Amino acid sequence: MDSPSHSREARVEKLKKIREQMRKSSHENRKEVVQEHSRMRIDPALERRLERKRMEAEEELAKIETEEEGGDFERRRAWDWTIEESEKWDQRLRKKKQTIQNVAFSDYHSQASKDYNRGIRDLKPDYEKYDKDKKEEKSKSRSVALYDEAERLDWVSNKPDKEHVERLVESIKKQDQRRLKNTKRRGTDEEDHITFINERNRKFNLKLQRFYSKYTKDIKEDLERGTAL
């Protein structure tokens, strides 16, 4: 068992390493900002990313220092941070968590729902043009009462604009690329037989397979031999 002095020395050494990493990270961040500034007069997304990294590093360091002193980090934050700073930081954490949940794969139903909403957002239907065309069709009719959209057949000869078709094709390509990227990240093949309903169930099935595959393999071979006979 480590002595208290040895344990404290280990924590101090860990704290020194973290501070050194922060110093190097800060130096690299400043160097990166200078390079980006000379290239394109500062990228707003880069500034936000670096600011987020800086705040996360400062919070992590404050947690470690507070634990070393035997204090409560939340109480220290309440003393050192203003209400506005604390609320802003909590909001950032919630937004970051929500973004991760939106991007991460949970199950195929939620994935299909996210793809549909993303597709609707990307396609952006032209409601003004739709209303304009509808009014023109109504004006062609002798009576508004005779205008029954359910009985119209002019949609058969309707041809969408070339721009809209290209946008749809581009959207489908992006969906295929995202699906391929997610498939590679999960380590699955699109042609594989799907035996799971979500990522958690897939990992559970793999664990079962590791422990019981030798038994199920024998049973499967026996069944195949019996079927062949």
Curated annotation (Swiss-Prot):
Residue span of region Disordered: 20-40, 106-142
Q: Quote the biased-composition stretches of kind Basic and acidic residues, using this chain's numbering.
A: 115-140
Residues in a coiled coil are 44-104
Compartmental location: Nucleus
Q: Which Pfam families match?
A: SYF2 (PF08231)
Task: List keywords of the entry alphabetically.
Answer: Coiled coil, mRNA processing, mRNA splicing, Nucleus, Spliceosome
One of the record's GO cellular component terms: spliceosomal complex
Chief subcellular location equals: nucleus
**InterPro entries in UniProt:** mRNA_splic_SYF2
Signal sequence segment? none
A GO BP entry is: mRNA cis splicing, via spliceosome
What is the similarity comment for this entry? Belongs to the SYF2 family.
Please give the subunit comment from the record.
Belongs to the 40S cdc5-associated complex (or cwf complex), a spliceosome sub-complex reminiscent of a late-stage spliceosome composed of the U2, U5 and U6 snRNAs and at least brr2, cdc5, cwf2/prp3, cwf3/syf1, cwf4/syf3, cwf5/ecm2, spp42/cwf6, cwf7/spf27, cwf8, cwf9, cwf10, cwf11, cwf12, prp45/cwf13, cwf14, cwf15, cwf16, cwf17, cwf18, cwf19, cwf20, cwf21, cwf22, cwf23, cwf24, cwf25, cwf26, cyp7/cwf27, cwf28, cwf29/ist3, lea1, msl1, prp5/cwf1, prp10, prp12/sap130, prp17, prp22, sap61, sap62, sap114, sap145, slu7, smb1, smd1, smd3, smf1, smg1 and syf2.
Q: What does this protein do?
A: Involved in pre-mRNA splicing.
Q: What is this protein called?
A: Pre-mRNA-splicing factor syf2
Organism equals Schizosaccharomyces pombe (strain 972 / ATCC 24843)
